[in-house]
Curated annotation (Swiss-Prot):
Pfam families: PSII
General function of this protein: One of the components of the core complex of photosystem II (PSII). It binds chlorophyll and helps catalyze the primary light-induced photochemical processes of PSII. PSII is a light-driven water:plastoquinone oxidoreductase, using light energy to abstract electrons from H(2)O, generating O(2) and a proton gradient subsequently used for ATP formation.
Encoding gene per record: psbC
Subunit-level organization: PSII is composed of 1 copy each of membrane proteins PsbA, PsbB, PsbC, PsbD, PsbE, PsbF, PsbH, PsbI, PsbJ, PsbK, PsbL, PsbM, PsbT, PsbX, PsbY, PsbZ, Psb30/Ycf12, at least 3 peripheral proteins of the oxygen-evolving complex and a large number of cofactors. It forms dimeric complexes.
Name listed for the protein in its UniProt record: Photosystem II CP43 reaction center protein
Subcellular location as annotated: Plastid, Chloroplast thylakoid membrane
Transmembrane segments: 82-106, 147-168, 191-213, 268-288, 304-325, 460-484
This protein's UniProt keywords: Chlorophyll, Chloroplast, Chromophore, Manganese, Membrane, Metal-binding, Photosynthesis, Photosystem II, Plastid, Thylakoid, Transmembrane, Transmembrane helix
Residues annotated for [CaMn4O5] cluster binding in this entry: E380
Record GO cellular component, one term: photosystem II
Xref: InterPro entries: PS_antenna-like, PS_II_antenna-like_sf, PSII_PsbC, PSII_PsbC_sf
Keyword rRNA-binding: no
Topology with respect to the bilayer: Multi-pass membrane protein
SS bond partners: none
Length: 486
């Protein structure tokens, strides 16, 4: 049924202008302006699917959207943590159960015993409940600011109000964010130094929770990671391999963030910065997306390669670690059967169990030689001044090393391994889904699409600042050339 009322004539005319003469309409239900004031197409220029773009000039409602979004994220975290707690099986390692949140909590030293054994899941339950309670508070705050609170904050709460073009206010907000990030960094430092410590996979005997009493504060060491090459055995910041450096790095990050935050709060942007940057809401969005993209892509590499910040006891072995574990497992087996592992040759004439690396070190032989520079807690005790120590290989291998290598051998992050030494012969899900693979892939794709979003919004912001037409010309939208649905 078509409805036409003379009182709606101005709305219909406006719709024709905004969309197309070929648009159709059955019954139009006008928005309740008391509820969605400043968030409809007529008042903002953005349709509902443009999301927060409708709230560019209504700071109070934009605050509500952000607080509600935080509530959603915290709710997922709490609910998913409780889901993992409910499905926890003590007899199986975390990485075999597909968990991605409990491993993070275990890394912080909660509920963990020697060797990475989970001895108490109650702390994880508490963390999940606290996140659910927090999400309820955030959800209420989001609804309040979205529906009841003032449209803009400038009149009611000047401290929280802002103008996107106010460069001094924007850098002050940046400074506040940096201070909060610095405080967050110091929370980890405080936990590691004073409140129970953190899990250290390098602790003697196969890993344990310990206090980090002497974090590395030498700037040459900490910033040396940043200046390292990201290629080969250098590994940039991903190459950190001890908890002292990791916690010391957080000390420096906290200091730099807080100092930078105070600087931005107390100062105004220099003239060159005023000229170089675009100062608009969409520009700030693009900067944020670019920063998040860098974080996501860095985290992707960190999860995949680093077994210090992401212990293999919780996340499963790295690819090189699983390959080396297989070579080690077969070496132990054949040595017990009487094989001379120091001199045995494989079918290619190279060492079957042990061989020389390009730099002359003794390494595991076979196809796993490509991962000769792997460092892992279960194999490091067997090294000497020139690589693997033959005397230790023959006399000092401990049962926990054998068990861990055998477990890692069958849980490679890329899938099942064959007996050659490290080649993935089955897709990941045939054997099991590695949390290390899952987190690596998810962070890579999130980082990638955040980078695309950065380019998109940066282009729009620069075009708007230069006075170009921004967005798609609505006259050329594909949908306008299609037949009406009825």
């Amino acid at each position: 049924m078509k409805v036409f009322v003379h009182g709606w004539q101005h709305k219909i005319s406006h719709t024709r202008i905004l969309y197309s003469l070929r648009r159709f309409y059955h019954v139009e239900t006008p928005f309740n302006q008391n509820i969605v004031s400043g968030r409809d197409l007529e008042s903002t220029g953005f349709a509902w699917w443009s999301g927060n773009a409708r709230l560019i000039n209504v700071s109070g409602k934009l605050l509500g959207a952000h607080v509600a979004h935080a509530g959603i994220m915290v709710f997922w975290t709490g609910a998913m943590t409780l889901f993992e707690v409910a499905h926890f099986i003590p007899e199986k390692p975390l990485y075999e159960q597909g968990f991605i949140l409990i491993p993070h909590l275990a890394t912080l030293g909660w509920g963990v015993g020697p060797g990475g054994e989970i001895i108490n899941i109650y702390p994880y339950f508490v963390v999940g409940i606290l996140h659910l309670i927090s999400s309820a508070v955030l959800g209420f705050g989001g609804l309040y600011h979205a529906l009841i609170g003032p449209d803009t904050l400038e009149e009611s709460f000047p401290f929280f109000g802002y103008d996107w073009r106010d460069k001094n206010k924007m850098t002050t907000i940046l400074g506040i964010h940096l201070v909060l990030l610095g405080i967050g960094s110091f929370l980890l430092v405080i936990k590691a130094l004073f409140f129970g410590g953190v899990y250290d996979t390098w602790a003697p005997g196969g890993g344990d929770v310990r206090l980090i009493n002497n974090p590395t504060l030498n700037p040459a060491i900490i910033f040396g990671y940043v200046l390292k090459s990201p290629f080969g055995g250098d590994g940039w910041i991903v190459s950190v391999n001890n908890m002292e450096d990791l916690i010391g790095g957080h000390v420096w990050i906290g200091v730099v963030c807080i100092a930078g935050g105070i600087w931005h709060i107390l100062t105004k942007p220099f003239a060159w910065a005023r000229r170089a940057f675009v100062w608009s809401g969409e520009a700030y969005l693009s900067y944020s997306l670019g920063a998040l993209s860098l974080m996501g892509l860095t985290a992707s590499n960190y999860v995949w390669y680093n077994n210090t910040a992401y212990p293999s006891e919780f996340y499963g072995p790295t690819g090189p670690e699983a390959s080396q574990a297989q070579a080690f497992t077969f070496l132990v087996r054949d040595q017990r059967l009487g094989a001379n592992v120091a001199s045995a040759q494989g079918p290619t004439g190279l060492g079957k169990y042990l061989m020389r690396s390009p730099s002359g070190e003794i390494i595991f032989g076979g196809e796993t030689m490509r991962f000769w520079d792997l460092r892992a807690p279960w194999v490091e005790p067997l090294r000497g001044a020139n690589g693997l120590d033959l005397n230790k290989i023959k006399n000092d291998i401990q049962p926990w090393q054998e068990r861990r290598a055998a477990e890692y051998m069958t849980h490679a992050p890329l899938g099942s391994l064959n007996s050659v030494g490290g080649v993935a012969t089955e897709i990941n899900s045939v054997n099991y889904v590695s949390p290390r693979s899952w987190l690596t892939t998810s962070h890579f794709f999130l980082g990638f699409f955040l980078f695309i979003g950065h380019l998109w919004h940066a282009g729009r912001a620069r075009a708007a600042a230069a006075g170009f037409e921004k967005g798609i010309n609505r006259e050329n939208e594909a949908v306008l050339s299609m037949r009406p649905l009825d």
